[in-house]
A protein has these predicted regions:
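Catalytic cores of nucleic-acid ligases and guanylyltransferases
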Residues: 1-195
């Protein structure tokens, strides 16, 4: 039976969380994608439920090459032009700039639902799957430490923001928000994501 997956969406907070149980990731400004490969078919589902597989063939190819029987990833489709990414090129998608999936969570692997597992376990497994350099897909690194300091640095660098998540939580739908945080820079208010 095909499981349904909804992304754990971030919510705004006024400041970054602190404490040992939090991890912090760069907030990317791309298309949120639930990427799945089931029975050999790859789908790239947007938040609105559209399949963008035809729009991003390089992401489809990368997911097809993974040495797994089935997989579901949560991430952002990005279009990089040099060291930064370009949302307009991603949206207009003329295929003259390569897109990639920046994967930050593993939701299912080889038929096993990973959502009940703690984020620490999911990210560790995801890192092992994606530690090779893959064209079209990459693992989103995280930082541990003082969220306020990381958020301040993100603002200074002009980044879109940071996402802060409790390392011990399972992945949960957006209705369950209460224990996770996502600070968003260019000095926007902080945001939180339930995971």
């Amino acid at each position: 039976m095909l499981r349904l997956y909804q992304p754990c969406l971030p919510t705004r907070a006024l400041k970054a969380p602190t404490g040992a149980n939090w991890i912090h990731e760069i907030k990317h400004d791309g298309f949120r994608i639930i990427a799945r490969r089931i029975n050999g078919r790859v789908r790239l589902q947007t938040k609105q439920g559209y399949d963008y597989a035809e729009r991003y063939p390089e992401i489809v190819e990368a997911i097809s090459r993974l040495k797994v029987s089935s997989i579901v990833l949560d991430g952002e489709a990005m279009c990089f032009t040099g060291p930064a990414h370009d949302f307009d090129k991603l949206w207009n998608r003329t295929h003259d700039h390569e897109a990639k999936l920046c994967a930050f969570d593993l939701l299912e692997l080889d038929g096993e639902d990973y959502r009940p597992k703690p984020l620490a376990e999911r990210k560790k497994k995801l890192f092992k799957l994606l530690r090779r350099v893959w064209r079209g897909i990459e693992y989103v690194e995280h930082l541990e430490g003082d969220g306020a300091v990381i958020f301040e640095h993100a603002c200074k660098l002009g980044l879109e923001g940071i996402v802060c998540t409790r390392f011990t939580l399972p992945s949960r739908p957006v209705e369950d928000l209460d224990q996770s945080q996502k600070p968003s820079a260019p000095c926007h208010a902080a945001r939180q994501r339930s995971v």
